[in-house]
Amino acid sequence: MRTYENIMIVHPDKVADEYNAVVEKFKGVLTDLNANLLKVDEWGVRKLAYPVKKQGRGSYVLTVFEADPTIIDEYERRLRLDEAVIKFQTVLLEKGFVEEAAAAAEEGANAEEEE
């Protein structure tokens, strides 16, 4: 299994219930495809660098997961078909990246506690 990071931008006009339904739907898709969810981080609504599908803002969702490389095409196909998702990108993380990031975050938290 490899570690992947996916960022998706959800249409900004979706109300909270619809937005949560989209996020839960794609968590379920990953689970159905036998992926292990490591992290789901909702960044909220942010301004886009350039308009995408005539939208200047979007709700960002970052997902980190472990999966077989064979499921990525199916996952991205489902993202492409959902009208609520206006843009997405999935990247393969280097081996050990998740552990290094967790260690760095822990060191940062310890430094803040000492101050």
Swiss-Prot record:
GO terms for biological process: translation. Keywords: Ribonucleoprotein, Ribosomal protein, RNA-binding, rRNA-binding. InterPro entries: Ribosomal_bS6, Ribosomal_bS6_sf, Ribosomal_S6_plastid/chlpt, Transl_elong_EF1B/ribsomal_bS6. Pfam families: Ribosomal_S6 (PF01250). One of its GO terms (molecular function) is small ribosomal subunit rRNA binding. One of its GO terms (cellular component) is cytosolic small ribosomal subunit. It comes from the Bacteria. Binds together with bS18 to 16S ribosomal RNA. This is Small ribosomal subunit protein bS6. The gene is rpsF.
